[in-house]
């Protein structure tokens, strides 16, 4: 009976040790970050120490089981108690290992977070130091410069210089010359003034030409009427033919004179490249009649010769 009580007391102590490890986190909650990290570190150290204490406990339990088995008469009951104790000891050891691993992972994550925070703070400090150093270098260079600092103003307007004006005018003139020298596939455009002037000139030339022809016909008719009869024995129809041919030659001679020029033959002053407008010569009834009479007189002459 005493052996069973001792055996139960040993198993109870081992179980209480495991439960104490699991519920060892009870206590006042930490208020700051430093206190929380300290509590995590303490719990990890405590779990690791309890895991280390399992070894001597297991050794002492094994020695006690061996002595009990040798000196006890109920060996079967000792073996059953030993199996139960071994299972509980194994479960408790695994529980201690899990607790230690969890505590270690938590502590590692906390340390990694603290390290990343410190790295961020160090990077911010380095950036601030670099900014201060750059500003210090610029300020030192500015103070070491011998020349005075000139005030800078924003340019609202850009005034071209004289050379730029000359170059711009020369480029515009060259562009205009290139455009004028290019061949155009269509005729050049006429202005309204050019059309009005050409229309006025054509009307004036037509009126003058008609007046000139009428005056010539009037002048030739009285001359032919007042002309003395020739002494040659020409027939009357031959004399009429001769008068009409003289009149036609006179008109042709007047038109072919180099001094007589029409206004329509000159090009316009507004557009020197424009086409020259020339009007066809007017043919009066007397000229046509002269040609017809000439043919008739030729036929009659041939008949008279026969």
Curated annotation (Swiss-Prot):
This is Probable protein ABIL1. GO terms for cellular component: cytoplasm; cytoskeleton. The keyword Signal does not apply. Binds SCAR. Involved in regulation of actin and microtubule organization. Part of a WAVE complex that activates the Arp2/3 complex. Belongs to the ABI family. Keywords: Cytoplasm, Cytoskeleton. It comes from Oryza sativa subsp. japonica. Residues 200-236 are annotated as: Disordered. It is found in: Cytoplasm, Cytoskeleton. InterPro entries: ABI (IPR028457). Signal peptide: none annotated.
